[in-house]
Amino acid sequence: MSKAFSAPGKAFLAGGYLVLEPIYDAYVTALSSRMHAVITPKGTSLKESRIKISSPQFANGEWEYHISSNTEKPKEVQSRINPFLEATIFIVLAYIQPTEAFDLEIIIYSDPGYHSQEDTETKTSSNGEKTFLYHSRAITEVEKTGLGSSAGLVSVVATSLLSHFIPNVISTNKDILHNVAQIAHCYAQKKIGSGFDVATAIYGSIVYRRFQPALINDVFQVLESDPEKFPTELKKLIASNWEFKHERCTLPHGIKLLMGDVKGGSETPKLVSRVLQWKKEKPEESSVVYDQLNSANLQFMKELREMREKYDSDPETYIKELDHSIEPLTVAIKNIRKGLQALTQKSEVPIEPDVQTQLLDRCQEIPGCVGGVVPGAGGYDAIAVLVLENQVGNFKQKTLENPDYFHNVYWVDLEEQTEGVLEEKPEDYIGL
């Protein structure tokens, strides 16, 4: 019997760069653009186990893995390389150590927000519940929009595989899903990232503080030095308490998040490595900037929390006063931008480059705009803007009326969706 799952994309609103250190909090919003996986067990007449994965929205989107060992990396039969799928299968099987042969088919879908929408054809499922864009090119040739597609992919494939071997794991132990996906994502990337994107894919909108990187680093060293011990150490790590923060959160009532795609593009790893180099070379200077940024981030989170609490205790007054009570939140966002501008200037890395400063300043002039930032590591490719819900239509219209003035920003069709990984109905994907 088939099972289906989905995991959200992310918008990283506060905590860029600081999130790499386990002393700082970050604020990450889960988005309505989701990655999907439908898993179906086939017959088990095979002598060796097999996992077939397809991504029908992209050309050549098929990978077939024959599994001869639970402790070796899977090999794709046509030598097609997909490091994220390989890593996920490898970590799941090393953890589960299945003793019986299995034959699994996984079909992956991604919502339109993850990729450029040029040269696409729309397809809708038989019951009308799901609609996806089909591309004429291979996935490696289609531009991504920076919503966390690799973290979403690893999370949803890990969830579907784990759910096959451990029924109901999604409802009984999300920490297992998170820990497996986090390890697999790091293994695929060959580095221990901050992990906020995987954490958001599993848990949803969160205030996040990272785990100690040594947790995963140590188990990878075991894999290199003593591979036979790896499954045992991996099991221990996945079952352990990582002591990281993932507090559920949500944007306040009446405030909407808009994600603006700006034709540009900047490679996140290059930005991050340059900032880390500056931090190493100028510890005192960087410490001042980090403190300034952290203070602004915490103020931003405090304002959001207080607005949510105010709505919960007295919704009527909150709604009545909302238009006039956003100023402290606007100030907090401006202070985050000042911190990012200082980081840009001191490190000489284009985190909030001049063109983005200009665009965000112009958005700020439109009635109903609470404030905007360059999300995540910053750069040229996106902006995230908070707008009063009753002004969203007018806000978008203003940017469309004068596209050159607003740098031809394209508002991606998505919104906050606070839930993390979810079980879906398999019938919603029939006919795609």
Curated annotation (Swiss-Prot):
Main location group? cytoplasm
Role of this protein: Phosphomevalonate kinase; part of the second module of ergosterol biosynthesis pathway that includes the middle steps of the pathway. ERG8 converts 5-phosphomevalonate to 5-diphosphomevalonate. The second module is carried out in the vacuole and involves the formation of farnesyl diphosphate, which is also an important intermediate in the biosynthesis of ubiquinone, dolichol, heme and prenylated proteins. Activity by the mevalonate kinase ERG12 first converts mevalonate into 5-phosphomevalonate.
Reactions catalysed, as given in the entry: (R)-5-phosphomevalonate + ATP = (R)-5-diphosphomevalonate + ADP
**Naturally occurring in which organism (per UniProt):** Candida albicans (strain SC5314 / ATCC MYA-2876) (Yeast)
> What is the protein named?
Phosphomevalonate kinase
Which Pfam family is one of this chain's hits?
GHMP_kinases_N
Q: Name one GO molecular function term.
A: ATP binding
The family note in this entry says:
Belongs to the GHMP kinase family. Mevalonate kinase subfamily.
